[in-house]
């Protein structure tokens, strides 16, 4: 889905390009074309999710003329906190991209590729899960 938005809106292309410049590699190519193995490396996943979410926020704000400057607060969970901070202008786009790349590298070192995982269980009580 982001590929179509990327193609259609120059503001999104510009932010993807800016992230590429900040990082010194083509994160945009990884986001748009993969391969999956590269996007699944958390050093890429972290800034990629941010770049996409921040691009969509900026698109809504500027292209569709929605005034989000009146927002009383921005919130996010985990990685989303960084998007919220950048959208609230508490962190710059460039600093957030670099920070999340480093955060991803640190997380990757803590859990080597192919080890560990994540699971979500919805709608079951604890006795069923045990």
Mark where each language-model region is.
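A short acidic, glycine/proline-enriched capping/turn motif at secondary-structure boundaries
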Residues: 56, 81-82, 106, 126
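An amphipathic alpha-helix/helix-turn recognition signal
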Residues: 14, 48, 78-79, 91, ...
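Alpha/beta catalytic cores of group-transfer enzymes, especially the acyltransferase/condensing modules
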Residues: 21-25, 87-130
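Gly/Ala-rich beta-loop-alpha elbow adjacent to hydrolase catalytic centers
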Residues: 53, 72-76, 80, 84, ...
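Short, glycine/charge-rich beta-strand/loop segments that flank catalytic centers
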Residues: 36-37, 73-79, 104, 116-120
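Helix-rich "cap/lid" substructures immediately adjacent to catalytic or cofactor-binding pockets
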Residues: 1-75, 124
